[in-house]
Amino acid sequence: ALITLELSLLALVFSMSLGLFVGIARQSKRYILSFPASWYVEIFRDTPLLIQIVWIYYCLPILLGVTLTAFWASTVALSLHMSAYVAEIFRAGIVSVDKGHVDAAKILGLNYFQTMTRIILPQVFRRMLPPLVNNFADILKLSALASVIGVYELLHSVDNVIMNNFRPLEMYSVLALVYFVLIFPVAFGARRAELYFARRI
């Protein structure tokens, strides 16, 4: 469980950071930023995470000459995959801001970065928080795919136990319960946050 949590938390931090950058780039009027950002989102949303994990683990070292451990290959793949979804959350939040606020920022002489950090992002944070929390729940669930390249997370651990005791029904049922215990508080918190902020928007 600790490896699953470590993998998920690292992917959360990296995907949030990269997703914010990509989301802002997608809304940029500069084609050199918006075009690659849009393709980045499409590529990682329109290909299976499992394929991305396998490709980064087996193919990326061939291209770059750098070997990644199974853990870090999974972390990178999960971070890149989820950052595409985070980028869309940020983009949707940015689009939802009243255009009059942006125009007012221009009149005040604020540049694009200042408008984002001082006017837009503070307003949309409340709207983005529930889907971002849900995003972490998705990361926890998807982390099980890391077992395909040998990361010793929950699913891989259970598979090893089953090879010794041949009790798949009991072990996979326990595994499902463990994931439920991990994910339910996150999902419940996201729903509560959504209701809380909905009353204040």
Where are the regions a protein language model picked out?
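Transmembrane alpha-helices and adjacent helix-loop boundaries
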Residues: A1-I201
